[in-house]
């Protein structure tokens, strides 16, 4: 089940609130310009599936998002626990960073913890299959796929170069809960 845990930056061990209803999660995130919605990921996809397989299976949803929101590039991150670079990828995504464009992810299998650092609060969004999250450009965040990743997410970009991160150099991500496998 998707959830949102909200922490004050000074209290990484105790969330101020935990939300599990879509409407509550979406409205809380919307206060900060973050869109959270459910889309149907009806085509079965196994983590580790190729980018081509995933894009082909979800071409209709991808085209809709690209047309409605002006995205120009799409890619897929598809990882399972057998991936040879899982530790390196996890370490890179766990560093707080921001992007010069919106970050959009449609989870079509598995789950991941997308954590946002906004002002004095940290919003940990557990995203699962069917979740669509859109984080505004410039928002500090990190992503945890767990020690044994099991997820597939379609990523959409305004930038033709795709995923370009600007790391903040802050160590805040290490102080907050991570995805439990």
UniProtKB/Swiss-Prot annotation:
Ni(2+) binds at residues 97, 99, 103, 141. Pathway: Amino-acid biosynthesis; L-methionine biosynthesis via salvage pathway; L-methionine from S-methyl-5-thio-alpha-D-ribose 1-phosphate: step 5/6. The record marks 105 as: Important to generate the dianion. The keyword Metal-binding applies. Pfam families: ARD (PF03079). The record marks 102 as: May play a role in transmitting local conformational changes. It catalyses: 1,2-dihydroxy-5-(methylsulfanyl)pent-1-en-3-one + O2 = 3-(methylsulfanyl)propanoate + CO + formate + 2 H(+); 1,2-dihydroxy-5-(methylsulfanyl)pent-1-en-3-one + O2 = 4-methylsulfanyl-2-oxobutanoate + formate + 2 H(+). The keyword Metal-binding applies. Fe(2+) binds at residues 97, 99, 103, 141. Keywords: Amino-acid biosynthesis, Dioxygenase, Iron, Metal-binding, Methionine biosynthesis, Nickel, Oxidoreductase. InterPro entries: ARD, ARD_bac, RmlC-like_jellyroll, RmlC_Cupin_sf. Gene3D superfamilies: Jelly Rolls. The record marks 96 as: May play a role in metal incorporation in vivo. Its cofactor is Fe(2+); Ni(2+). Binds 1 Fe(2+) cation per monomer. It is an enzyme of class 1 (oxidoreductase). Its EC number is 1.13.11.54, 1.13.11.53. GO terms for biological process: L-methionine salvage from methylthioadenosine; L-methionine salvage from S-adenosylmethionine. One of its GO terms (molecular function) is iron ion binding. It comes from the Bacteria. Catalyzes 2 different reactions between oxygen and the acireductone 1,2-dihydroxy-3-keto-5-methylthiopentene (DHK-MTPene) depending upon the metal bound in the active site. Fe-containing acireductone dioxygenase (Fe-ARD) produces formate and 2-keto-4-methylthiobutyrate (KMTB), the alpha-ketoacid precursor of methionine in the methionine recycle pathway. Ni-containing acireductone dioxygenase (Ni-ARD) produces methylthiopropionate, carbon monoxide and formate, and does not lie on the methionine recycle pathway. Monomer. Belongs to the acireductone dioxygenase (ARD) family. This is Acireductone dioxygenase.
